Design a protein with these regions (language model features):
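A generic structural signal for short beta-strands and their flanking turns/coil linkers
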Residues: 444-446, 466
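Alpha-helical transmembrane segments and immediately membrane-proximal extracytoplasmic
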Residues: 1-436, 441-442, 475-477, 491, ...
Length: 511
């Protein structure tokens, strides 16, 4: 039986098989990501302690320089051996699901794990969440290859692994599912969402077993409801965050050019750019150790400290600049949590300014930390649903959902008006442009929904790329074989046979 025949049979597979596979992915990916998260947390604690001691013991600074350089060299060799461990990892997962990238799961898994732990532990302002998504996806890919699944089934497991990775990193299972649908897979498929949700829930259970049941960013006191008469402030905040988000994306997509210039000056190959980054971070570690790392501890501290406008502004500037420097190095590490941290600081700056103007009182400042995270991330990622649910799950307070929704929507609209792209899609385009072109013509099956733009049209009237065959249309649990005179029905699911390297092109045509 060839792969296409297997896909035809598995399209009607009972959902309990999807649940079973989701459990398998959730347990394994949850364990891998939870260990990754635990090691990073321990490494970050040690790093902060050493920096605090070094301020009073200059000899320790020499030790920090030595260790940082050794770690940077080790990570550089890991990157040289496997380029797909660079950066966040989310664009790599998206590229694989589109049939554009085909990395070795084991080669990426262990190198991303080790490189991420080393890089983030020295204090670089990188997030664990992007790598966690890639680690979850590669763990799931390994399971799929072990189970000898078809290419289509493998993609479902990879998507579920990505959801499980985010869930275990943030204890946010619903956001894990939404992120896969909104940012990675781009549409609902029954087998995808059942497998992904199961994997997310199981991975979250594994993570909760290790880290406890409090939300990742649980606030120390209950947040008050924001008065309706002041909602105009939320609109201003959304505009502010949208503009900042656009600026962030513009720079983060170009920071690599800065390192290319430095690389020419210091005669460094790209995999050793991190040698400069680990030196850049030392002054921040000595004088602002609480600003190091991904930023979750800083977000919690903002809630308790209520920093003045000048302090919050200084923190925002430092985090913005050094987050860019950290990510531009190409070290394994993401921008997911750093984006949330910049959003929290932006919200804090905004709230402090409006308090000085007399529009807010101090009890409302913590609300703006939450709103800043949701709006900033929603703008940069252009995944507003994920932003809203993620922040709500992380904070553990459903009462703020209305205000979060307003700010996230406005920030998203501003970002769209300014012409900003979803940051991970933009990174994927850059990645593909600098990767060897796919020339293979491996047939595989994909499923896509019939959208409003296609509903009511005849199949023979569609302009399809070469090698694309629409085989089946399923509507209200009724299956029909597709031919030229078949009329597409809104809400139906189409099963198509395409060349694997054309998945992205076909999805754009249908979605």
């Amino acid at each position: 039986m060839n792969e296409i025949e297997r896909d035809f049979r598995t399209q009607s597979m009972h959902l309990l098989w999807s649940v079973w596979r989701g459990v398998l992915v959730g347990v394994t990916a949850g364990a891998v990501v939870s260990l990754f998260r635990w090691l990073i947390a321990k490494g970050a604690q040690i790093s902060v302690t050493i920096y605090q001691e070094a301020l009073h013991n200059p000899l320790l600074i020499l030790g920090i320089v030595f260790v940082n350089l050794v770690f940077a060299i080790l990570i550089g060799y890991l990157i040289k051996q496997e380029k797909d461990i660079k950066g966040s990892g989310i664009p790599h997962v998206e590229g694989e699901l589109m049939g554009l990238l085909h990395p070795s799961w084991w080669s990426v898994l262990w190198r991303k794990f080790l490189g991420g732990v080393l890089g983030i532990s020295v204090g670089l302002m990188l997030g664990r969440e992007g790598p966690s998504i890639q680690l979850g996806a590669m763990t799931a890919k390994g399971l799929a290859e072990g189970l000898k699944l078809s290419a289509r089934e493998k993609r479902v497991l990879i998507a579920a692994g990505a959801a499980a990775g985010l869930s275990a990193a943030f204890n946010a299972p619903i956001a894990g599912l939404l992120f896969v649908v909104e940012e990675v897979y781009h549409h609902f498929s029954r087998h995808v969402w059942v497998t992904a949700l199961t994997a997310s829930l199981v991975a979250n259970a594994v993570s909760l077993r290790i880290f406890g049941q409090l939300p990742v960013l649980a606030m120390s006191e209950k947040l008050p409801l924001f008065p309706l008469k002041d909602y105009w402030i939320l609109i201003v905040l959304g505009i502010f965050l949208g503009v900042l988000g656009y600026g962030y994306e513009w720079i983060v997509l170009r920071i690599g050019k800065f390192y290319q210039v430095l690389g020419k000056i210091f005669h460094l190959p790209s995999h050793f750019y991190g040698l400069l980054t680990v030196l850049f971070i030392i002054p921040i570690g000595l004088y602002f150790p609480h600003l190091l790392g991904g930023g979750n501890e800083l977000i919690l501290a903002l809630n308790d400290l209520h920093p003045a406008l000048t302090v919050a502004g200084l923190y925002l500037a430092i985090r913005f600049i050094w987050s860019m420097l950290s990510f531009g190095s190409g070290f394994p590490g993401g921008i997911f949590l750093p984006i949330l941290t910049l959003g929290a600081l932006s919200g804090s700056v905004f709230a402090a300014a409006f308090e000085n103007l007399g529009f807010l009182d101090s009890t409302q400042l913590p609300i703006f930390i939450i709103l800043g995270m949701a709006g900033y991330f929603g703008a940069v990622s252009k995944a507003p649903l994920t932003a809203m649910i993620l922040v709500t799950e992380m904070v553990g307070d459903l009462h703020q959902l209305m205000t979060i929704g307003v700010v996230t929507l406005i920030a998203y609209l501003v970002m769209d008006f300014l012409g900003g792209e979803p940051v991970y899609e933009a990174m994927l385009h850059h990645l593909i442009d600098h990767s060897p072109k796919q020339v293979d013509k491996i047939p595989t099956m994909i499923d896509l929904p019939v959208t409003d733009s296609l509903a009511g049209r005849l199949v023979k009237d569609l302009t399809l790329p070469d090698g694309v065959l629409i085989s089946t249309q399923i509507f209200q649990d009724q299956s029909e074989v597709v031919h030229g005179d078949t009329r597409l029905k809104a809400g139906a699911t189409l099963y198509l046979v395409v060349n694997e390297s054309n998945i992205s092109q076909v999805r754009k045509l249908f979605l």
